[in-house]
Amino acid sequence: MTNSQAPMQAAEVRVYPIFTVRWLAVHALAIPSVFFLGSIAAMQFVAR
């Protein structure tokens, strides 16, 4: 009943790139969105 391979053998470790097309797309949308939300929030405190 002995197995030639260890049952809890670690799988190959993959190294993923940080900058991907998805990363660029998310940040291209997220950064201006946060900027505009902050701008709109700041406008609420500007007295006319």
UniProtKB/Swiss-Prot annotation:
Pfam families: Cytochrom_B559 (PF00283)
UniProt entry keywords in alphabetical sequence: Electron transport, Heme, Iron, Membrane, Metal-binding, Photosynthesis, Photosystem II, Thylakoid, Transmembrane, Transmembrane helix, Transport
Required cofactor names: heme b
Record carries keyword Membrane: yes
Positions contributing to heme binding: H27
Entry superkingdom: Bacteria
Cofactor note: With its partner (PsbE) binds heme. PSII binds additional chlorophylls, carotenoids and specific lipids.
Bilayer-crossing regions: 23-39
Keyword Thylakoid set for record: yes
InterPro entries xrefs: PSII_cyt_b559_bsu (IPR006241), PSII_cyt_b559_CS (IPR006216), PSII_cyt_b559_N (IPR013081)
Main location, first listed in the record: membrane
GO molecular function: electron transfer activity; heme binding; iron ion binding
Protein function: This b-type cytochrome is tightly associated with the reaction center of photosystem II (PSII). PSII is a light-driven water:plastoquinone oxidoreductase that uses light energy to abstract electrons from H(2)O, generating O(2) and a proton gradient subsequently used for ATP formation. It consists of a core antenna complex that captures photons, and an electron transfer chain that converts photonic excitation into a charge separation.
Protein family (similarity comment): Belongs to the PsbE/PsbF family.
Protein name per Swiss-Prot or TrEMBL: Cytochrome b559 subunit beta
Higher taxonomy: Bacteria, Bacillati, Cyanobacteriota, Cyanophyceae, Synechococcales
